[in-house]
């Protein structure tokens, strides 16, 4: 998820323990993947005004942690303030922190699994790739 500011594009990163990632989650039975992406963003951040300015193209990670594959869409929002609501299943927020970051900041904290997704998103929105 990205947000355009007067200083340029920012990416929303969420931290769970020491790991930074984008909003993500499980596709429920009968749910379309893009609808699941919208729902997960809303559940994890309360942001409900996503626009898919660059279409429904997505990127997936390489398999990780028990062969999971995360699918990421590039959504845009104008929302600056992010809330981390309590998950009914966990009894606490799913994430410890949220932060809007520029490309260099994201690449500095992104795991090797997430970094290719960041670079793809940066290319889609027209940010030149910068080494971390």
Regions found by a protein language model. Give the residues of each.
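The catalytic Nudix box helix
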Residues: 22-56
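NUDIX/MutT-family hydrolases
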Residues: 84-121
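Active-site-adjacent beta-strand/loop module that shapes the phosphate/pyrophosphate-binding cleft
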Residues: 58-86, 99, 121-128
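Glycine-centered loop/turn positions within well-structured domains
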Residues: 18-20, 43, 80
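N-terminal strand-loop-strand
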Residues: 1-23
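Residues that flank catalytic or metal-binding motifs in active/ligand-binding sites
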Residues: 16-18, 69-71, 94
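Hydrophobic pocket-lining residues within nucleotide cofactor-binding pockets
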Residues: 27, 77, 106
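Short, well-ordered beta-strand micro-motif
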Residues: 1-3, 74-76, 102
């Amino acid at each position: 998820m990205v947000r355009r500011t007067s200083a340029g594009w920012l990416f929303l990163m969420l931290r769970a323990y020491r790991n930074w990632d984008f909003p993500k989650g499980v596709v429920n039975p009968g749910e379309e993947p893009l609808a699941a992406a919208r729902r997960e963003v809303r559940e994890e951040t309360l942001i409900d005004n996503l626009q898919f300015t660059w279409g429904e193209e997505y990127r997936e990670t390489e398999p990780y942690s028990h062969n999971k594959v995360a699918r990421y869409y590039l959504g845009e929002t104008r929302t600056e303030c992010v809330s981390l609501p309590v998950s009914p299943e966990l009894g606490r927020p799913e994430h410890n922190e949220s932060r809007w970051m520029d490309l260099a900041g994201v690449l500095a904290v992104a795991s090797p699994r997430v970094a290719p997704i960041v670079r793809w998103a940066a290319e889609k929105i027209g940010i030149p790739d910068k080494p971390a």
